[in-house]
Design a protein with these regions (language model features):
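A structural signal for multi-pass alpha-helical bundles of membrane permease subunits
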Residues: 3-293
Length: 293
């Protein structure tokens, strides 16, 4: 009895710091954001009148907010699809294929993930620089000067330029996650499939993909959360939301710290509900029976 009590005390003691930190830095701020969104406060310090849902009514009629939501939906969709495909492709090649320099490529692919978003923004500012940037210079060298653009200054393509940077930053992280799952798949499954005449492509779709599916489902949630956060930082550093690049967190930031604190919190509530709902939808539509080996 005393042993069980000691074990229970030890478990609670280990969990307590994490629970306390989660309450202080996640639960309390989230509740505060919801509460403040119903008031008319200009800043964090001064009180404001209770306005119920007025902030939300104004928010949903603001074309800038609607455009920012369209931008983040486009960004999440493209970043998720392209990163998912490339990360799985590279993970498969580095796990299932034998060639020289595998460890080198693992390191190269992962390097962008250890760089801060500020460094990545600086790298792509140099790449996209219109007059003597790396990309335009390369296009001129290979005789495609007609394709040169102001990559971060043209409203028609600037969002796609940002998306490319976010994809480059994310591939290595998800590749490593998928490699970890693929490495745990028993080799005898592939050997049996080969004896049955299954080629590598069929083996991928019949063995690899089903057995790493739960990992893919988990990473889809990461895609949503990380893209919302990283797109804000990248946009804030490079364009500050101009040229139609504003995403919801930029919109929230600009409003909350420009004398519309409660209105910015209302935008924050919408962003939270959007990310929560999208994560739930992705979790449900990708749900399938767990395959074990």
């Amino acid at each position: 009895m005393n042993k069980k009590k000691a074990q229970r005390t030890f478990i609670f003691g280990c969990l307590a710091p994490a629970v306390i930190l989660a309450i202080l830095f996640i639960a309390v701020p989230t509740i505060t954001v919801f509460k403040e969104s119903f008031f008319d406060k200009t800043d964090l310090i001064h009180d404001g009148a209770f306005v119920a849902l007025d902030n939300f009514k104004v928010l949903f009629s603001d074309e800038r907010f609607i455009e920012s939501m369209q931008n983040i939906i486009l960004t999440i969709t493209l970043v998720t699809l392209v990163t998912l495909i490339l990360a799985i492709l590279f993970a498969t090649l580095l796990t299932r294929e034998e060639f020289r320099g595998k460890n080198f490529f693992r390191v190269i692919f992962y390097i962008p993930n250890i760089l801060s978003i500020v460094v990545i923004a600086g790298i792509f500012a140099a790449i996209y620089q219109p007059s003597n940037g790396i990309l335009n210079s390369f296009l001129e060298v290979i005789g495609l000067s007609g394709l040169t653009r102001a990559w971060m200054g043209d409203p028609d393509i600037v969002n796609y330029s940002i998306i490319v940077a976010l994809i480059w930053q994310a591939i290595g992280y998800y590749m490593v996650m998928y490699m970890a799952s693929m490495s745990s798949i028993p080799e005898n499954l592939y050997e049996a499939a080969s004896l049955e005449g299954a080629g590598k492509i069929k083996q991928f779709f019949m063995i690899t993909l089903p057995l790493i599916w739960n990992n893919i489902r988990t990473t889809l949630i990461f895609f949503v959360i990380s893209t919302i956060n990283l797109s804000f930082m990248f946009v804030q550093i490079n364009t500050e939301g101009s040229l139609g690049t504003e995403v919801p967190l930029n919109y929230m930031y600009n409003k909350a710290f420009a004398g519309n604190y409660s209105y910015g919190m209302a935008a924050g509530v919408c962003i939270f509900l959007f990310s929560f709902a999208l994560s739930g939808i992705l979790n449900n539509i990708t749900k399938r029976d767990v395959l074990e080996f």
